[in-house]
Amino acid sequence: MEALALPERTGGFANPKSSTGRIDVFTRVITDFGVEFDKAPPGYKGHLYLEVSPRTFPVLVRAGSRLSQIRFRRGNPAHSDAEIKRLHQESALVDGRANIDGGLALSIDLAGDKQTGLIGYRAKRHAGLIDVDRVNALPMNEYWEPIYNHGKNQLILDPDEFYILASRESVSIPPTHAAEMVPFNPLVGEFRVHYAGFFDPGFGAGLEGKGSRAVLEVRSREVPFILEHGQVIGRLIYERLTDRPEVLYGKSLSSNYQRQGLRLSKHFIQE
C-alpha cells in the first residue's frame, strides 16, 4: 500500500514491529530492484512489498494491518563505543554497570520473578489463529507454556522452538536518541534473538531511573543450546536523532510496552 520518494541522502531501514516479532512472525520489506531485504537505498522512489512468514502460529492479516516499521537515516548516525559511554554518563542507559564493547551489552534474566520464579514463555504448537489487529483478545494459556526457574538459573533451548524471555538489565533510551539491537552474532550462540530490533526515543525513560526491560524473541537453531543467567545475548547501538520528537514513546502514545517486564504481545489477555 505504501510507496517511498526519498531524498538523495536518505535511506530507509525496516524491521518487524514488536507485536509482530512476539508472535513469531518474521517480515521482510522488499523494494523494486533491491539487493538487500529491509533496506531502501538513498533516493529510492518506488513501491514497497512485504514478505510475511508466520513460524509458529497461524495469523489473520488484512489490507492495512501494520506488521513492519521503517526508519529513515541520513549518513551514519550510529555512535561509537566512546560516544555511548559518554551518553551513559550523561543519562544512565541501563541500571547497574554498563558493558560497552561493540555496543551496549544486554544479558538474559534466568533468575526469574522473585515471587513466582517465572523466567519466560515457550510457544505452543498447533494453537489457534491470531488476528493481528485484535488487542487483549486471546487467552495466553492456549498459546504459551510458562517456564519457571527451578533453582538452576539456566534454560535449555530446544531446536526450532520459540521463546519469550527478558533482559536482566532495564534499558532507557534518551529522547534525543533511538537504538537498535545488533543483528545476530554467531559468536553469541546458536540461536536468534530479537526479530523486532528497534527501540524508540523515550523507551524506558522518565521512569525514575528504573527503565524498562527488553523483551526478547528467541529461537534456537538445529541443536539444543544452554543459556545461563547473565549470558550476553545482544548489543544495542545508539543513534542520535536529527531532532527531538514532539511526542515520545510512553503514555502519550498509549505505547503497549512502556514500563514492561516480561510481557507477551498485545494480542493476549494479561494481568
What are these regions (language model features)?
Residues 1-271:
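DUTPase catalytic domain/fold
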